[in-house]
Amino acid sequence: MDGSQLGVSRRDFLRAAGVAGALGVSGSLLGARAALGHGGEDHGADHKAGHGAADSGGMAAHGGNGTVGDVDLSRFDPSKFLREFYWGEERTEGGRTVREYELSAEAVEVEVAPGVMYPAWAYNGQVPGPTLRAREGDLLRVVFRNRDAHPHTIHFHGFHPAGMDGVFELVAPGQEFVYEFDAEPFGCHLYHCHVMPLKKHIEKGLYGAFVIDPREGREEADELVMVMNGFDTNFDGANEVYAVNTVAFHHQRHPVELKLGELVRIYVVNVLEFDFVNSFHTHANFFDYYPTGTRLEPSEFTDTKMFAQGERGIMEFSYDFPGLFMFHAHVSEFAELGWMGLFDVKE
């Protein structure tokens, strides 16, 4: 039984689940909330006691918010995904670089919190799909195979011919399509399915980041990819779980390791459905922000950035002090439901 059948709003669900969790109640309606380890609404005392007392896993750092247990990281590991880039198979044709990628759409179960499985549609069996990467001016060839029971496509943000737009050329189950276009403009982009109902095809997981480097390159940095997403686990048209790279609170349990003083570059993409905006906030630090990454000079120096759906950009910063530093959505509900993590800065 889902929340819509019970006539329960998302916020009613959130309020009730804390009480039910304390009483040991389980079930599909309460499973996501219970896995996220929430208790009652008043976390004030825990919050004050928790700060400055983070353990190595970061779980004591914020009043007990976090998951109970861990997901099966052999299925999908957000920590590995952070620094994985799919450059494709590179060859030279007619004096220019050609990159060929292979993507497939298929139905998979994704673990978004410990024991909470979500029936997803995914590119190459993972949510988000692989982070595609190329250099400005490369010729890209993407072989797409549909291994699902529904028609799907790939729509790439960027420049390409009309026939490569992934809107009208539906790929039927068991069929394939080859997208071919030049890698431009440089920047931080995304790709996603564009079959109607569009909301369903995106929120079920058919999306990924798409990075094009400028011809002259960028300054060397520790590069990360963070795709901000959410999951409607009871199918009521509202998210119960929020995350960076799919798994709630993953980077609170497994902090992102950074080196003191080293330049960090994060490619941030927002694909959140059902909510108008998302956000990214860094504690004890500011970052240079490059909207869509299509300019080589930052537009602002800030510690909080708002993102509409499909909006993306590049954040650059370094830390002057070692230790654990929080980052999270500055929409409090999102942070409490999984979109929260830690940077572990080491000398």
Name what the model sees in each region.
Residues 141-143, 147-221, 302-347:
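Extracellular/periplasmic metallocenter environments
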Residues 156-159, 273, 280-287:
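Short acidic, flexible loop segments centered on an aromatic residue
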Residues 218, 224-233:
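Surface-exposed beta-loop interaction hotspot
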Residues 294-303:
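Solvent-exposed, glycine/polar-rich loop segments of beta-barrel outer-membrane systems
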Residues 162-165, 285-295:
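Short aromatic-acidic-glycine turn motif
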Residues 150, 199-200, 274-277, 288:
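Short beta-strands and strand-coil junctions in structured, solvent-facing domains, enriched
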Residues 1-12, 16-27, 36:
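N-terminal secretory signal peptides
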Residues 23-25, 29, 33-151, 160-162, ...:
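N-terminal, post-signal-peptide metal-ligating segments of extracellular/periplasmic oxidoreductases
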